[in-house]
Regions:
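Intrinsically disordered, low-complexity regulatory regions
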Residues: 1-103
């Protein structure tokens, strides 16, 4: 029997090529993990999270990269978009963790 409430990803009728874009976002995020600065094995983002400032840090970076979008001549606009999406995902995970902690 087909599960109509949870269709396979391929069955969704995407209008804006979201499936491909999600794959590109995943590839971008994967590529960043060998570029992070770390101290004692922790990324700076993890240290910021530990200090209780991750939400503001993510929102600030989302704003920063949104304001930079298309401003630098010769820069790939997608790079700023990828950073925005990555910080949004980190923020979503932080919010999910906060929601789990408040239950």
């Amino acid at each position: 029997m087909r599960d109509v409430y949870n269709p396979p990803l391929d069955m969704n009728k995407y209008k804006f090529n979201e499936k491909e874009k999600i794959g590109k976002v995943r590839d971008y995020i994967d590529s960043t993990y060998d570029k992070h600065y770390s101290h004692g094995g922790e990324q700076a983002t993890e240290v910021i999270k530990g200090s209780g400032h991750l939400e503001g840090f993510c929102i600030g970076n989302i704003i920063k990269y949104a304001q930079r979008y298309g401003k630098k001549v010769g820069e790939d606009k997608n790079n700023n978009l990828m950073k925005i999406v990555h910080y949004a995902i980190i923020l979503m995970e932080e919010q999910d963790g906060n929601d789990r902690g408040s239950r």
